[in-house]
Amino acid sequence: MLSPKRTKYRKAHKGRIHGNAKGGTTLNFGTFGLKALEPERITARQIEAARRAITRAMKRAGRVWIRIFPDLPVSTKPAEVRMGSGKGSPEYWVARVHPGRVMFEIDGVAPELAREALALGAAKLPIKTKFIVRSVDA
C-alpha cells in the first residue's frame, strides 16, 4: 500500500478540502482517465483496491498511472478509551482529493475496455467520478 517513506511531522491536523483542484486536472500520461467530481479523503486501501480492479479488468495489458498519493496521516484512538490524554497514534494514510483532480490514467487498451476498467475502479472509491478521454489537438 502507498505511504510516505518519511515525513516532517508524525501527526497532522484534520483540515478541510476547499475549492477545486489547482493542478492535476488534465491527462498527462495516458489516453483515458478517471476524474474526481467531489471533495473527499481517499485512503491508501481504497487507492490500492481501485488500482487492482482496473489492472484486473485490463487483463494486465496496457499501463496504469496513479496520480494521487496518500501523504496525510490519520490518527485514531483505541476503542473504549476515555477522552483526553493526547491524540491517538497514526493508523492509516489518506490523500486529499479536490473536485477536478485526475486520479487514474490508463493507456494501451481499447476505449470500451478502458471505460469498463475505470468504472470498476470507480466503484471502489467513495466519490462520484467522470471518465475522460484525451482530446486530439489539431
From Swiss-Prot:
GO cellular component, one term: cytosolic large ribosomal subunit
Top-level taxon of origin: Bacteria
Region (Disordered): 1-21
GO annotation (BP), single: translation
GO molecular function, one term: tRNA binding
A Pfam family hit: Ribosomal_L16
Basic residues bias locations: 1-19
CDD domains hit by this protein: Ribosomal_L16_L10e (cd01433)
Transmembrane regions listed in the UniProt entry: none
Gene3D superfamilies: Ribosomal protein L10e/L16 (3.90.1170.10)
Entry annotated with the keyword GTP-binding: no
Keyword match Ribosomal protein: yes
Keywords, ordered alphabetically: Ribonucleoprotein, Ribosomal protein, RNA-binding, rRNA-binding, tRNA-binding
Function: Binds 23S rRNA and is also seen to make contacts with the A and possibly P site tRNAs.
Similarity field: Belongs to the universal ribosomal protein uL16 family.
Quaternary assembly: Part of the 50S ribosomal subunit.
HAMAP family: Ribosomal_uL16 (MF_01342)
Cross-referenced PANTHER family: 50S/60S RIBOSOMAL PROTEIN L16 (PTHR12220), LARGE RIBOSOMAL SUBUNIT PROTEIN UL16M (PTHR12220:SF13)
Record protein name field: Large ribosomal subunit protein uL16
Gene this chain is encoded by: rplP
